[in-house]
């Protein structure tokens, strides 16, 4: 466990954190940050990248002459073990990595589907969402996935992409990793109820945003998606598909490929 403590934290005072840390019986390390309270600490995030270097990478029994297929496991903020599918071009060259998130109620995309990005010279790091997690846990898992992807030696930078819930997580990951995420694409992001924070994350984006909206979506209503898109002040573009519901849109996926790789 890597444990960080802001010495000016009044929400969870250092003395309270002492008890938690002292009760840990596993291998552990603690870092103190004078002058920081209960807030995000960039220096600690940077330490996490090194900490995640030990994330196990297991080869898969699938291969092609141009791509390597692997499963990466890493630890979530709450201690749970998370898994991601990782596909990268053969070799040790550092390449842009598509940080991919899937929708609620749908599985992670198939290996061969994601290989399309390898043809463009990109890697793919696709998180397998926890089925029963609440919104805040899902947001935290997205950040953990971004850190794990960044810890891989062949990652140059990140491109966030997702549909539905995945679109929301892509926007959140891009907002929280502005120095590493260079583009973000989201289709029908969930943006009401527990996911209303999506608009706040959109307002923090500095990378270009591509957004797709289904005109008949009742799960992520177009009016709610308007709030998300309007909140973004970055370079942005949106496509509206009037006759579609909350479903996969092949035409938008073509737009995503062109957005990520302008030569497509």
Predicted regions located by residue number:
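Short beta-strand/loop motif that positions the catalytic acidic residue
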Residues: 3-5, 205, 211-213
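C-terminal catalytic histidine-bearing segment of alpha/beta-hydrolase fold enzymes
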Residues: 14-60, 223-264
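Short glycine-enriched nucleophile-adjacent loop
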Residues: 20, 167-179
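N-terminal cap/lid segment of alpha/beta-hydrolase-fold proteins
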Residues: 57-92
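Short beta-strand element of the alpha/beta-hydrolase
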Residues: 94-103
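Short amphipathic alpha-helix adjacent to the substrate-entry channel of hydrolases
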Residues: 109-127
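Alpha/beta-hydrolase active-site loop
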Residues: 133-152
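Alpha/beta-hydrolase fold nucleophile elbow
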Residues: 153-164
